[in-house]
Amino acid sequence: MKIGVLALQGAVREHLRHIELSGHEGVSVKRVEQLEEIDGLILPGGESTTLRRLMNLYGFKEALVNSDLPMFGTCAGLIVLAQDIVGEEGYLQKLDITVERNSFGRQVDSFEAELDIKGIANDIEAVFIRAPHIEKVNSDNVEILSTVDDKIVAVKEGNYLGVSFHPELTDDYRVTQYFIDHIVAEHKHAAV
């Protein structure tokens, strides 16, 4: 399968590496037209306000709001997928959750943890950098996959997966593989 990484900011190369390690083709997505060529899209971390501004500038918001393309958001990508953000309206509003930005602290408060992620594994390496957390799940359709210190850090809803951390900054590509082999594959199979 062809999996795109939105290449406007963030660790694009690292995500592409994880896609390839998962046995699939990674595509650096810089133009809206490329969305037609891929089976799923990863929204990488970075700075969420900048990411939203760039998505508006290049026409990605409208295209993705109207799409059922499977998407995987990491850190800032999770914020972009959220229905609501504490203190402001959500952006793509694909995951029926409320997120709080930078809830684990500033850059100096970054940390690594080993997570038990439902349906994937109980020893997933996770890097948290100015990470958000999911304050609230607003629908029974949202499945909580993992928590850290009682804060929700990974969820799945339909075609969408969101995590607070940066799986691409480790050598552990199992979260990306889960997105492709389960969420993207199920969507592709259902569309046939």
Curated annotation (Swiss-Prot):
It catalyses: aldehydo-D-ribose 5-phosphate + D-glyceraldehyde 3-phosphate + L-glutamine = pyridoxal 5'-phosphate + L-glutamate + phosphate + 3 H2O + H(+); L-glutamine + H2O = L-glutamate + NH4(+). L-glutamine binds at residues 46-48, 101, 129-130. The keyword Hydrolase applies. Pathway: Cofactor biosynthesis; pyridoxal 5'-phosphate biosynthesis. GO terms for molecular function: glutaminase activity; pyridoxal 5'-phosphate synthase (glutamine hydrolysing) activity. It holds the Pfam family SNO. Keywords: Glutamine amidotransferase, Hydrolase, Lyase, Pyridoxal phosphate. In the presence of PdxS, forms a dodecamer of heterodimers. Only shows activity in the heterodimer. It comes from Staphylococcus carnosus (strain TM300). One of its GO terms (cellular component) is glutaminase complex. Its EC number is 4.3.3.6, 3.5.1.2. Transmembrane segments: none annotated. Catalyzes the hydrolysis of glutamine to glutamate and ammonia as part of the biosynthesis of pyridoxal 5'-phosphate. The resulting ammonia molecule is channeled to the active site of PdxS. This is Pyridoxal 5'-phosphate synthase subunit PdxT. It comes from the Bacteria. One of its GO terms (biological process) is glutamine catabolic process.
